[in-house]
Design a protein with these regions (language model features):
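Transmembrane-helix motifs of polytopic, lipid-linked glycan transferases
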Residues: 7-29, 67
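Hydrophobic alpha-helical membrane-interfacial segments at the cytosolic entry of transmembrane helices
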Residues: 120-145
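Specific aromatic-rich, kink-prone transmembrane helix
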Residues: 19, 60-77, 87-91, 108
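Membrane-interface alpha helices of multi-pass inner-membrane proteins
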Residues: 83-98, 108-110, 128-137
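Multi-pass, polyprenyl lipid-linked donor-dependent membrane glycosyltransferases
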Residues: 5-12, 40-67, 72, 81, ...
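Transmembrane-helix signature of polytopic, membrane-embedded enzymes
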Residues: 20-44
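Short hydrophobic alpha-helices at membrane interfaces in multi-pass membrane enzymes
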Residues: 33-36, 74-92, 122-126
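Membrane-proximal stem/loop segments at transmembrane-domain junctions that anchor or position
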Residues: 144-210
Length: 210
């Protein structure tokens, strides 16, 4: 029952608010009034609860990515291996749940390299490399496993440019950039050939913009 997934989504939403409070507590020196404001407004932000129905890994993925940033901050302060390993683990979990979270992994890697300018440490380089590795390798491992189970090389799916093309479509019944099926029919029109679909996507973007 998909409604079970909606209920499960509630837990990471509460977790997101909890991590936000912990971040605030660290940044503002355990300021009680500030903490109360953050807790109050976090739960008052009702749109996050509307995403209960988005059972696509968005909510738990965001929760794990926030935990990754939290333990990154703790690692910068403590230099402990435990905090580094937890940061890496939560990055991997976030990206597995939602591939878009690789953006957060890239941000963590950039923060590590910026930190190197202040603190010369090979552990920071190791952290940056590990974060990027766990963001990329699990996806490749899953694809290899799927290929092995299928007994052949599976199609890589819709090219990402089709989603960009859909985002540039003039909106009708939905808001601009919302899902409207454009990526599906472009892929179908290309007979599910990723290369042909890429060219159709580029042409659609040109038509929409110019």
């Amino acid at each position: 029952d998909v409604r079970f997934l909606y209920a499960v989504n509630l837990l990471p939403i509460i977790g997101i608010n909890f991590v936000t409070w912990k971040f605030t507590d660290r940044c503002f020196g355990q300021n009680h009034k500030t903490n109360l404001y953050v807790i109050f407004f976090s739960f008052l932000f009702l749109p996050q609860f509307f995403f209960l129905a988005f059972a696509y890994g968005i909510i738990p993925g965001l929760f794990f990515m926030l935990l990754a940033f939290f333990f990154l901050d703790k690692y910068f302060e403590s230099g402990k291996w435990k905090d580094m390993l937890l940061c890496i683990l939560f990055v991997m979990s976030a990206v597995i749940l939602k591939g878009n979270n690789i953006i957060g992994a890239i941000a963590i890697a950039i923060l590590c390299f910026l930190r190197i300018l202040k603190e010369r440490s090979w552990k920071l380089i190791l952290l940056a490399v590990c974060v990027m590795a766990v963001s990329i390798l699990p996806g490749k491992a899953f694809h290899a496993w799927y290929d092995n189970e299928a007994g052949g090389v599976l199609c890589g799916g819709k090219p990402k440019i089709l989603w960009i093309a859909m985002g540039t479509e003039p909106y009708y019944n939905n808001a601009a950039g919302w899902y409207n099926g454009c990526s599906d029919w472009l892929f179908s029109e290309a007979k599910y050939d990723p290369e042909k679909a890429t060219e159709l996507g580029k042409a659609k973007i040109r038509d929409n913009i110019y």
